[in-house]
C-alpha cells in the first residue's frame, strides 16, 4: 500500500471529529442568528453514520430544546447538501423587539423613524415569499460562502438545478417555511390583496425606471458647473463728462419731429449706460434652490423636477419633431380645450 495515499486511523478519526464539531457549531451559530433552516455541505447522514448522526441531532437539539430534522438534498453530479430544520428562535425575536436602542432615540432620530414608518405605511406591501424564493435565498447564501468565485448568475443557475433535482420529501421543509411566511404576512398585512400588473404597465414601469436613471445620472453633471466671470454684468466706466442733453425741438411745419421725441432721451430708458451694482453670481442658484425647497415642502418630501419631467412619455407632447400642421393634442387633453 502506498503510504502517500493512505492515512492512519487516528488521523481519519481526527478529521471526522473536526468536521463533526464544525457542522454542529455551524448549526448553533445560525440558530442564534435567527435562522431555522441551515444548509450543510455533504451528505451528513452518510458521512457520520447511524450512531454519530443521532449524536449530531442530540447536540444540535440541545441548543433549541427541540428535536431537529435532517433532509438530504441531491444537487446533481454527485454533489449533496444536508438541510437541518430547527425550531424558530423565539428568544432572538423577543430580544430584537425589546432592544434598548429604541428607547434612547433623540428627537431627530425619532422624527426620522416616524417618517420612515409613514413611508412604509404608504408603500404597497410586498408579496409573501414562496418556497422557491425562500430556498433560493438560503441556498444563495450558502453557495456564496462555499464558492466565492461564482458569479450571481452562476449561483442562480445552480440553485435552479438543485431545486429541480430535489425530491418531494426534500421540498417539504421549504413548502412548510413558505406556509409559515404566508401566515406571518397575513398577520402583518390583514388587508393585503394581490393585484397583478396590467400587460402594458410593466413596459411603462421599465421605461420610467430608465428615464429616472438617466435623470439621476445627468443631474449631478448639470449641477456641478462653475459660473464664468463673464456671467456677471459688466459695468461701464464712469466718466466725469455730463450726460448728453437734448435740444428742445418744437413740432412745426418745417420740423416734422414731434414733441414726444424728447421722451426718448429719458435716462431711465437706457439703464445700461449708467452705473449699476454688480449682481452676485450665485443669486440664480440660491433662488432656484429656494424655489425647489418650497415645492418639496408643499407637494412631497421627495419632489424632484428632473424625475417629474422624466415621468412624461413622448406621447404626452403633441408638437414634436416631425409633426405637421394637422397635429392634434393627445386624447387626455382634447376634452379640456
Curated annotation (Swiss-Prot):
A GO term from the CC aspect: nucleus
DNA-binding interval(s): 125-193
Chief location of this protein within or outside the cell: nucleus
Keywords for the protein's UniProt record, in alphabetical order: DNA-binding, Fertilization, Nucleus, Transcription, Transcription regulation
PROSITE patterns listed in its UniProt record: HMG_BOX_2
Chloroplast in keyword set: no
Subcellular locations according to the entry: Nucleus
InterPro entries (UniProt xref): HMG_box_dom, HMG_box_dom_sf, SRY-related_HMG-box_TF-like
Record carries keyword Cell membrane: no
Positions of the UniProt region annotated as Disordered: 171-219
GO function terms (MF aspect): DNA-binding transcription activator activity, RNA polymerase II-specific; RNA polymerase II cis-regulatory region sequence-specific DNA binding
GO aspect biological process, one term: single fertilization
Biased composition (Basic residues): 200-212
Record-linked PANTHER family: SEX-DETERMINING REGION Y PROTEIN (PTHR10270:SF161), SOX TRANSCRIPTION FACTOR (PTHR10270)
Protein name (record): Mating-type protein MAT-2
Record organism: Cochliobolus sativus (Common root rot and spot blotch fungus)
Protein encoded by which gene: MAT2
